[in-house]
Swiss-Prot record:
Comp. bias intervals (Basic and acidic residues): 246-283
Ribonucleoprotein in keyword set: yes
Keywords (A to Z) from UniProt: Ribonucleoprotein, Ribosomal protein
HAMAP family: Ribosomal_uS2_B
Molecular function terms, GO-annotated: structural constituent of ribosome
Pfam family, one: Ribosomal_S2
A Gene Ontology biological process term: translation
GO CC annotations on file: cytosolic small ribosomal subunit
SUPFAM superfamilies: Ribosomal protein S2
Gene: rpsB
Protein name: Small ribosomal subunit protein uS2
The family this protein is said to belong to: Belongs to the universal ribosomal protein uS2 family.
Length: 283
């Protein structure tokens, strides 16, 4: 079954690029035609690249990897949160903080601080030993950290891949991922540089419907990878048989000895019966 159809891409406006005066010549091979001063993206190529990106994300997640969803522009914020949360993946939809990947050790300390503040009860002034002003300042600190780092609070280490909406706007995320050799999966509009991306999807990164559709496809790939991972875990480690208690082993061994003895009795009787006629003949 196809991941997505050409009709779905058309209905979501994935084929609309930027104005012809705002383009990157490196994207020429992905452009189908020009219409009314706007480039039209070749959706047949988009379908092919979607399949490649889908397979990569699925395999990465199936092997235990995480995909970081990144999209801070207004058109992407809602779908980034919705789809990443649906499949339990980390996300950044407000602001990319410098060093989120390349200086993750420091970011981890800020995440620990966020969790520390979340554990505090800001309504109990008397029991906290702090003034109202101090509690207010701590509450504001928590809100700021939640806004900036809430999406990656459960990300234990740098991700194994990054999904990016609008590579030009998220150039900091792209740069950090490339420094760490983290594969980048991204929508490539006609003004983008395809050399910055490992798994490109030629498409419209400005329209809400286009961004939502493509982000959902990547989330679906992650969901399928999670199912494959779960199935692999259940199949790889079969439950070991419990060791047999000593009393049960002795009982079975005793029964076995009795069975062997009973089996020998008919043989002995048959041997005696055979020996009897021989004795009569000799007499």
């Amino acid at each position: 079954m196809a991941v997505v159809t050409t009709r779905q891409l058309l209905e979501s406006g994935v084929h609309f690029g930027h104005q012809t005066r705002r383009w990157n010549p490196k994207m020429k091979r992905f452009i189908f035609t020009e219409r009314n001063g706007i480039y039209i993206i070749d959706l047949h190529q988009s379908l092919t690249y979607i399949d490649k990106a889908y397979a990569f994300v699925k395999e990465t997640v199936a092997k235990g990897g995480q995909i970081l969803f990144v999209g801070t522009k207004k058109q992407a914020q809602e779908s980034i949160v919705e789809q990443a949360t649906r499949v339990g993946m980390p996300y950044v939809n407000q602001r990319w903080l410098g060093g989120m990947l390349t200086n993750f050790q420091t970011i981890s300390k800020r995440i620990a601080r966020l969790k520390e503040l979340e554990a505090m009860d800001f309504d109990k002034v008397s029991g906290s030993g702090l003034t109202k002003k101090e509690l207010l300042m701590l509450s504001r600190e928590k809100d700021k950290l939640e806004k900036d780092l809430g999406g990656i609070r459960d990300m234990p280490k740098v991700p194994q891949a990054v999904w990016v909406v609008d590579t030009k706007k998220e150039h900091l995320a792209i740069d950090e991922a490339r420094k760490l050799k983290i594969p980048v999966v991204a929508i490539l509009d006609t003004n983008c540089d395809p050399d910055e991306v490992d798994y490109a999807i030629p498409g419209n990164d400005d329209a809400i419907r286009s961004v939502s559709l493509l982000t959902r496809i990547i989330a679906d790939a992650a969901a399928e990878g999670l199912m494959a991972r779960s199935a692999g875990k259940s199949g790889e480690q079969p439950a070991e048989a419990e060791p047999m208690p000593d009393w049960e082993r002795e009982l079975l061994e005793g029964d076995g000895a009795k069975t062997e003895a009973k089996a020998e009795e008919p043989k002995a009787e048959a041997k005696k019966a055979d020996e009897a006629p021989e004795a009569e003949k000799s007499n």
